[in-house]
Regions:
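Membrane-helix interface "capping/anchor" motifs
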Residues: 33-42, 87-92
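Helix-coil boundary and interhelical linker segments in multi-pass alpha-helical membrane proteins
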Residues: 5, 9, 56-65
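Structural signature of hydrophobic alpha-helical transmembrane segments
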Residues: 12-21, 65-73
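Single conserved hydrophobic/aromatic residue that forms the stacking wall/gate
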Residues: 1-11, 172, 177-182
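Cytoplasmic-side transmembrane-helix entry/capping segments in multi-pass membrane proteins
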Residues: 39-48, 95-98
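Structural signal for the N-terminal portions of transmembrane helices
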Residues: 9, 13, 118-135
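Extramembrane terminal tails and long inter-domain/linker segments of multi-pass membrane proteins
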Residues: 150-173
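Transmembrane alpha-helical segments of multi-pass membrane transport proteins and ion-pumping complexes
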Residues: 20-33, 48-55, 59, 71-83, ...
Length: 182
């Protein structure tokens, strides 16, 4: 009947979450610095988010060391994911795919590697679950995209793309042109 009962578990989750976030930012900053010879604040912040996403699946099962490892690897995965999307010429201006998809997959699988019930069986459960959820999401998205495409299309015209969607949709720019060199 007491609200404070079990707060030790809450504090543990808070600590593992904060450690993973810090390690994600640090991992992304160091890795992107080594890779690009440049420290980029957006890569650092996406690394923090990658660390947070990575630890979410197992924050209750990890100790501080595991949280730091999962967060740092999550941050590095974000940097590699951004590079992969750039190489594939896929547009993701805020890095949502590397942060949420790639670091999320890592965090889900990491439960099977580092969690309280880690082991081969748990790893396989995490891997299979990730595949099942991924397949469901891909199939659902394709169905929705096909419906939207048949009703109104999925792309804007090249002219609208060049002008910028803020200008076309809202008749003004949400960012001044000096922000992006226009």
């Amino acid at each position: 009947p007491y609200l404070s009962r079990g707060l030790g578990d809450v504090y543990k989750r808070q600590v593992t979450t904060c450690l993973a976030a810090a390690a994600g930012g640090l991992g992304a900053a160091i890795f992107s610095g080594l890779l690009y010879k440049n420290l980029d604040i957006t890569m650092f912040m996406n690394g923090v988010l990658g660390g947070l996403v990575g630890i979410t699946a197992g924050a209750d099962q990890m100790g501080p060391t595991e949280a730091i490892a999962i967060g740092a690897i999550g941050g590095i995965i974000v940097v590699l994911g951004v590079a992969l999307l750039d190489k594939c010429k896929l547009d993701d201006p805020v890095g949502a795919i590397p942060v949420h998809l790639f670091a999320g997959i890592w965090g889900t699988v990491a439960v099977g590697l580092f969690g309280a019930s880690a082991g081969f069986d748990q790893f396989m459960v995490q891997l299979a679950s990730t595949g099942i959820v991924g397949a469901f999401c891909v199939i659902s998205t394709l169905i929705i995209a096909l419906i939207v495409k048949s009703i109104m299309g999925l792309r804007v015209s090249e002219d609208e793309e060049i002008k910028g969607l803020d200008s076309v949709s809202y008749t003004h720019l949400t960012l001044p042109t000096k922000c992006w060199g226009g």
